[in-house]
Amino acid sequence: MQKRNILGIFVGLIIGLYTVLGMSLFTFINLKFNSVYYAQHIPHKEGTDPDVIMLMENMGWAYTPEIEDISYDDDGMYAITRNKGTKTSILGLSGDTLYFSSASGDDYLLNRNFSVQHAFDEHYHKIKYNQRKVQKEIRETVQPVIDAQPKPLINLQWLFNLIYQSRFN
């Protein structure tokens, strides 16, 4: 009788452990795959653009649809390239730095809070820049990808907000 009770407790603990691990894995994957959708709906202060940041940070997880004139690079540095006629703009992420090459040929280095740290022209001379204009150009580059993000089957917006609220405010 004693062995049966111990075996029952052991089996119950194993089943409980697998259930908790499975739910944790599902939650992690859900938050990664749907991070761009959740970031679109999180309250944030002006100028932070959490949807663009989440798209770049989780590009390996997020939905990246085939869209005309947009290509993706995910080997080494995550990047999104958008061709508009003869003009090309590129937004890339390497480590903690966002890199944006505008269609006009100017290059910008941004931190993960989406603020410009350095700006250069095509000859690598420092240039003056307008933060809002740069952010608008970046948004134009990636907006079709952001618009294509599907709604999650199980919405964990509350958990995403809990985790990322302090970062985007």
Where are these regions (language model features)?
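Sec-dependent N-terminal signal peptides
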Residues: 7-15
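N-terminal export/targeting and maturation segments
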Residues: 14-97
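Positively charged n-region of N-terminal signal peptides that target proteins for export
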Residues: 1-4
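Extracytoplasmic electrostatic interaction patches
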Residues: 60-169
